[in-house]
Structures are given as structure tokens and as C-alpha cells.
């Protein structure tokens, strides 16, 4: 048995275990002058330092605040190529349609990714995942979705599988961009070939579909997600990024883990999420990078929804390599309070991935936690441009 008593905790701050909805997202537990006992990578006890159980191994954290490790529920961390020319063109006023016509946009990323080996994709993704972890993300979801064909999608997921030896990763098969021709045959192939293969090889725990006018229709999304559920996979949906066409309502009907983006969500979508068990995942890095309207985080919480926050790390719309930064942006751009943002980036983000064993500092939870530079946990939401995270601990081990 491996046991350590962590002391020197000015504030131990945590939401309760499990998904938090509405006003409950603001209800954090704060223990001052605290201690935490970790046994075999799992939290065994938390409380006042003066009441701490005896232990032969004591680690003094030095009088700083401790919070749960962050969970990033939405990334596209595996890609090849770059979008630097697109970025310069866009900020110079070039329309996206013209960028696509020049050979840029998402299809340039798809071409570069499809041309890359598994080994090359691993090497490209590793420093991105290291940056996320350094920012406080102890668990990270990674999607496929940049493959020009099914073989490229498989290589992306195989790269994630290799990287799972180094990081806590949750792999998702993303059905992202419809082909320019033969859509019906493509959707049929996804349902009858790609999803069964991914499920049989255990390369993903969930299937996500981009449901938008420019992507997959509601009916196509329904067909794909039904196939995923038939093969024992969880389901998620990208919806309401540009227009609300019914993807959110479909996700709630199907019991999806989460609906992600939601920048264009209106009252009907907010009410559907509030009445469901589906997590509303908002992505403020997209708002920052593209200058688009923010998702209605404040309205979602006030309606009683469970809100999570992710980076949406990707080369086109959110080149954001910090989970702490998007926590801070959720406060500034989406109207969350700091306690709500902490809940959104921990227990609710874990719930959006189907995880129940992490996100809170409580007995029985994985000992994933952050020691900050500050003695006040609110620096996590306050600081911009530098990391307030001093140490990252996964299963009781500093990484």
C-alpha cells in the first residue's frame, strides 16, 4: 500500500462529487489549513490538518491552495499541418469561402493529417497534450475527425491509443466533415464499417457528430448516433455553433453525454438541456479566437443545466493550449462565476465524458489535483497570461 498525507494546504477547494446543475455549481467546499490523505492513487480522507490521521509519509505543499485537476472534455489535439496562412487572411478580412477556395481551411488540415503516419501524429500531439497538462488538465478528451478517409480516422485514434501510455486521455470518434460527393454512402459506411471497427478495437469510448447546416443533418446525425449506441458507444454532438437546427434537441432525446458549442442556442435549446441529463459544454476559446458571440453560459446555469467548459484545442478555431485559460475566459466571456467555472472544468467536464471517479477532492475519487502558486484558489480564474498552477498531480503522483 502506498500512502501519503499532503499538508501545507492553505485552502482545499472542491465541488461535491458528481454532476452539478444550476445553482449547485456555485456550492463549493472550502477547507482552510487542510490536509489530504492519498492511498494507492485515491483520496482516502480530507479535513483539517489538526485532525489528520497519522501517516509515515508526509508531503508539505508549502501553504498553497489546492483544487481538483481540471478535465478538458473537448479537444482536437491530433492534427498535422497548420492554419497560420488562414489566420492571417481571416484577420485581413478574407472570407472563409475564399480561404477554402485557395486550398486552406479545414480541408487543408484534413489533407495534412491524412498524409501523416501514426508515429508522426503521436509526435505532433505530444507537446500539445503536455501543454494542456501543464495548464492543469489531468484528463483530456481527444477527438478524431480530420481524416479524409476511414483509414486516416483510424490512424488518428491509434495515435491517441499510443499516447494513453503517457496521459489520461479519453478517445472520441468524431464524424466531422461530410464528403463533397456520395454523402449517403459515406454515412452508411460510417454506420456499417467505421463504427463497428472502432468499437471492436476499443479505440473510442464515444462517437461525436458535427450537426450543422454545413455539416451533417439531424437525420444523418440520428442515424450515426444510433449505430454508435448499438455498438455500445456513448454519444455526443457538436451543435448550435452557427445555427440551431435541432442537434441539441436530438442529443437530449438520445441521452447524449454532452452537446458542445451552443453559441447559437436559443431558449428552446436551453430548456431542452435544463430538462435533460445531457451536459452543455461551452468553448470560450472559439469566442476569443474567432470573435463570435459567446455561448449562453449564464442563461444555461440559471435555467438549471449542467455546464462544462473545454478548450476545443484545434488549429482552425481555437488554438488554445490551456485549460486554466478557458476557465478564466468562461468567467469573462460567458458570465460564469469563479465557483461555477471550477465546477464546469472539473466534475461537470468529467460527467461530459462519462467519468464519475474524478473531478472532486473527496474520499473515493482519483487523487488528481493542482497545487497553485497562490494561497487563494481564486487566482485560478483571475490570472491571465501566466500559469497560476505550480504542480500537477495525477493519482497522487506529481507529473
Curated annotation (Swiss-Prot):
InterPro entries in the cross-refs: Amidohydro-rel, HutI, Metal-dep_hydrolase_composite, Metal_Hydrolase
UniProt binding sites for Fe(3+): 74, 76, 238, 312
GO biological process terms on file: L-histidine catabolic process to glutamate and formamide; L-histidine catabolic process to glutamate and formate
Protein origin, superkingdom: Bacteria
GO cellular component entries: cytoplasm
Pathway: Amino-acid degradation; L-histidine degradation into L-glutamate; N-formimidoyl-L-glutamate from L-histidine: step 3/3
Subcellular location: Cytoplasm
Cofactor: Zn(2+); Fe(3+)
Family membership: Belongs to the metallo-dependent hydrolases superfamily. HutI family.
This protein's name: Imidazolonepropionase
